[in-house]
Regions:
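Short acidic, hydrophobic short linear motifs in intrinsically disordered regions
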Residues: 407-425
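Basic, amphipathic N-terminal segments
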Residues: 2-304
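Short alpha-helical segments that sit at the start of domains
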Residues: 365-408
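Soluble catalytic regions of membrane-associated enzymes that act on cell-envelope
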Residues: 426-440
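Transmembrane alpha-helical hairpins and terminal membrane-anchor modules
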Residues: 299-372
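A short, conserved structural fragment
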Residues: 438-452
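Short, amphipathic alpha-helical interaction segments positioned at domain boundaries
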Residues: 460-484
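Minor-groove-contacting beta-hairpin "wing" of winged helix-turn-helix DNA-binding domains
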Residues: 453-460
């Protein structure tokens, strides 16, 4: 679409983007002997049942704590407990500690200031400035948590709300974008005038770019740079090459998306009537440039100060031109008409453009509520708990399979081989968390280290004997006995 190529560089995700059933069956089919294949499938089930049992108590504590802070029914349950304010605050912090641990285990990351700046440095479908009404958000709960649990690169708004993100995708939209293209042409002309008048530094709305984003002026690939990072192209109208074909024809724009976003916050309240509800909202496939649609307690959008400045300057220039034309000895009616038409046309364009953007905003908000919001509260927490189990099981199975097939390995070699297996068999890339997987294997008792620190596993049959029959297996056998 244009000569400029804008690429966003992001850290590669740790989540394994392969469904567990597909992963297990693919690995099982790589095993030559049918008896070993059967033992491997049995081991996979026992690993999952055991890991699920490990997390059961922690998940139960999490859900019980959330029931006290559920925005819908939590207040009634808290009232029944007859707890003091200090006791409630302790329970709040315990809930957040459990929640943030689950987030980390599910490979969700807190969006940093840098990521937010990169995400919002462009425009996609949402072309209105969206801000949060901070007066409607609590500033105590999260601030207290992060004071006790400091983390690097936290965003400025973390005392009011936290945005977790996981997974990167691509969203494409094809349309004529007539109004947006007109806006783009006007913006370029306005930028040109500012450069002529040496005022671009005062009026420029472009945010400062950080090294995380690489804008390339050619299509040359750089395959040897940052192989471990994920590079995603952003195609925007702002970078479009001006031509009759581009202006009048359909255009495809492209924006990276956050595959999953979870927002945590609490609404503001008074001391006399405190609101203890904690909101946990879950969204999917949110374009980075439109990330504002997931913000809590949004203000109603309006014209920006820059829009008003542009509007007033244009009106003043037009009026000066009209007055100057009238005061001339031979006032030209058509000149006056042309100037007035231009000013009125620009004012009308500004108004209708704003109305169109407002309608788009309302449509996106509705879409985020019905199409892009997966769940909230208890449903989100249950989803997270299952995510943790699925991820841990996949990590353990892949690590054991590599040790079983390729023999002893150092931690670094095991990490590399696991990532290569995922890439070769499934065509996916991820930053494999080998440390966590090895810890689980050692805890299960089916992997050990030799005298020089290399990891090795026991045989499949022995691994099943060490783990032993799980409760789920005993229940299934009992059912089969009752239903011969």
């Amino acid at each position: 679409m244009g000569k400029n190529k804008e690429v966003i560089r992001l850290e590669r995700e740790s989540v394994i983007p392969v469904l567990k059933p597909r992963l297990i069956m693919t690995l099982a089919n790589l095993i030559e002997h049918s008896s070993d294949r059967a033992e491997f499938l049995k081991l996979c089930k026992r690993v999952e049942y055991t890991i699920r049992a490990w997390y059961l108590l922690q998940f139960e504590d999490l859900m019980q704590l959330y029931s006290l802070f559920d925005p819908v029914h939590g207040a009634q349950k808290l009232e029944q407990q007859h707890l003091s304010s200090d006791e409630i605050q302790v329970l709040e912090q315990n809930f957040l500690s459990y929640l943030f641990q689950i987030m980390e285990k599910s490979n969700f990351k807190i969006t940093s200031d840098e990521e937010v700046e990169i995400a919002l440095s462009g425009q996609y479908l949402l072309n209105l400035p969206i801000t949060v009404d901070n007066s409607k958000l609590d500033k105590v709960l999260l601030k207290k948590y992060f004071t006790a649990h400091p983390q690097p690169n936290l965003p400025d708004f973390v005392d009011k709300y936290v945005i977790f993100r996981r997974g990167i995708g691509i969203d494409r939209t094809t349309d004529f974008f007539f109004m947006e293209k007109v806006d783009m042409v006007i913006a370029r002309f306005w930028a040109y005038l500012l450069r002529l008048m040496k005022l671009e530094k005062i009026f420029s709305r472009q945010p400062k770019r950080r090294p995380m984003e690489d804008s390339k002026k050619n299509d040359e690939a750089t395959p040897d740079v940052d192989q471990d990072d994920l590079h995603v192209e952003r195609i925007r109208l702002e970078n479009m090459e001006l031509s009759v074909r581009n202006m009048l024809g359909k255009t495809t724009i492209q924006e990276p998306t956050f595959d999953r976003i979870i927002v945590v916050y609490r609404r503001a309240s008074t001391k006399s009537n405190p609101d203890r509800g904690i909101y946990v909202k879950h969204f999917k496939n949110i374009p980075m440039a439109d990330m504002e649609i997931v913000l809590p307690e949004k203000k109603s959008p309006g014209l920006t100060p820059m829009d008003w400045v542009t509007f007033l300057v244009s009106a003043i220039v037009g009026l000066v031109a009209v007055v100057g034309s009238i005061e001339m000895p031979k006032a030209d009616f058509w000149v006056i008409f042309a100037v007035l038409s231009t000013v009125i046309g620009y004012c009308a364009k500004t108004y209708f453009s704003f109305q169109q953007n407002l309608a788009t905003y309302q449509n996106l908000i509705t879409q985020s509520m019905y199409d892009k919001q997966l769940d909230s509260g208890r449903g989100t927490l249950l989803h997270l708990c299952d995510d943790v189990i699925q991820q841990e099981v996949k990590e353990v199975i892949i690590s054991f399979f590599i040790l079983m097939e390729q023999g002893k390995s150092t931690l670094a070699d095991l990490d590399l081989r696991c990532e290569e297996l995922i890439k070769e068999e499934f065509g996916e890339r991820c930053n494999f968390e080998v440390d966590d997987a090895v810890q689980k294997l050692e805890k299960l008792g089916i992997v050990s280290r030799d005298t020089i620190g290399r990891y090795f596993c026991v045989g499949l049959k022995r691994a099943n004997e060490i783990i032993g029959a799980t409760t789920e297996e005993l229940v299934l056998k009992a059912r089969q006995g009752l239903n011969p």
